[in-house]
Amino acid sequence: HPSERMRALVPIAGVIKRATKPEQVQAIIDRYAACPGWNGGHYYGNEIDGGVFDRMVADRIERLTNYGIGTHLADTVSDPAERERIIRGRAETWAREFDANSLYILYRAGIGSDMTPLAGNIKAPLLNVLADTDSVVDVALGQPTVDLLKSKGVDAEFHEIKTRYGHAGPMIDADLWADKLRAFLDRIP
C-alpha cells in the first residue's frame, strides 16, 4: 500500500474534507459556456478564436493575484507593468498547458470529498502547514484536522506560518518554516 512506503507527508494548504457545492461547478461551466467557441466543452483547436484561451488567462490572472502571488510581486518588483507582465506570462503558460474542462471536473470531484473515514489509514508521519492569511484554506482548520488525525492514530503535527502571501505563502515563504520541516524530517527514520 502506498501509505506504507512513504516516509513522511507534508501537505501545504490542503484540507481533509472539501466543501465544494454543485453551484460552484455550474458557475465554472457557465463562465466557459459564455465563450463563443466553447461548444459544450469541445473547444479544442479553437481555443484562441473561440475565447476559451482568453477566459483561462483572465481566470488564472485573478487566481494568481488573489493567491498571494500579486502581493509577493508588489513586494519584490517595483514596476507595476513588469508585475503585470510576469503574472500574464504565468497565466498564458498555464492556459496553454491546462484543459479548461479540468477546471470544473476537479471541482466536481470535490463534491462530497471527505477523507475523514480513511484518516486512520495514514501510516506516515504528517506535518500540516497552513498560512495565517490563506483565503482558500482557513488556517482555523489546521489544528482541528491534526487533532482528528491524532485521534485516528496518525503521528501528526500542525504548523501555522505568518506570511503576507496567502495561499502561496508556504511556498513563497518556505524559509519561515524550513527549520520546522527539517526537525520534522530529522525525527523520522
Residue ranges and their predicted role:
Residues 119-123, 149-152:
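Short, conserved loop/helix-junction motifs that constitute active-site signature segments
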Residues 122, 128-130, 134:
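Short beta-strand/loop motif that positions the catalytic acidic residue
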Residues 111, 141-142, 184:
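Flexible, glycine/threonine-enriched loop-and-boundary segments that flank and lead into catalytic domains
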Residues 135-144:
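Conserved alpha/beta-hydrolase "acid-adjacent" motif
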Residues 102-118:
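Active-site nucleophile elbow and catalytic-triad environment of alpha/beta-hydrolase enzymes
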Residues 2-93:
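Alpha/beta-hydrolase-fold enzymes
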Residues 1, 11-16, 131-133, 161-164:
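An acidic- and aromatic-residue-enriched active-site/binding cleft used to recognize and process polar
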Residues 150-189:
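Catalytic active-site module of serine/aspartate enzymes centered on a nucleophile-bearing elbow/loop
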